[in-house]
């Protein structure tokens, strides 16, 4: 049975899910900090086995990002990602201040654009411009 659990900050689950979808590996310290600084974490389970997760990060007043939306390959195309994103969006709506608006953004993993368009996340427009990303690396001296 598919269930959703909120605010479980389990580094081993996070790192395992990232590894199962082939994402860049993180140190345990990075992963713990990422989880600790998330506004909301929702983990998806099939019975007691973690099969996905998603996080909301941001300032909680003006801008939030959907981050690390993961469903492991053998559970993709079963609408689990849609159920997860519905819960993440509902959370952002619940924290949006009355008579204001929250900007909800994401960086879409390559090949997942069609899924994200379902949720009205489109490509760059003349009004909004493209999303950009820069990775910052600091080497130990």
Give each language-model segment a name.
Residues 1-28:
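Short amphipathic alpha-helix that is part of the acyltransferase structural core
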Residues 6, 67, 107-108:
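Small/polar loops that bind or transfer phosphate-bearing groups
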Residues 36-54:
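Conserved beta-hairpin
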Residues 96-130, 134:
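Conserved active-site alpha-helix within GNAT-family acetyltransferase domains
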């Amino acid at each position: 049975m598919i269930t959703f659990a909120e605010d479980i900050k389990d580094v081993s689950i996070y790192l395992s899910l990232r590894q199962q979808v082939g994402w860049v590996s993180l140190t345990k310290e990075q992963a713990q900090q990422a989880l600790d600084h998330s506004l909301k974490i929702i983990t998806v389970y099939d019975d007691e086995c973690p099969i996905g997760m998603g996080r909301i990060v941001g300032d909680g007043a003006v801008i939030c990002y959907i981050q690390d939306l993961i469903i492991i390959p053998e559970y993709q195309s079963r609408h689990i990602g849609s159920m997860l994103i519905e819960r993440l969006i509902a959370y952002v709506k619940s924290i949006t201040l009355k008579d204001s608006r929250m900007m909800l953004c994401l960086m879409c993993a390559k090949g997942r654009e069609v899924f994200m368009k379902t949720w009205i996340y489109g490509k760059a427009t003349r009004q909004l411009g493209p999303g950009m990303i820069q990775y910052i690396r600091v080497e130990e001296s």
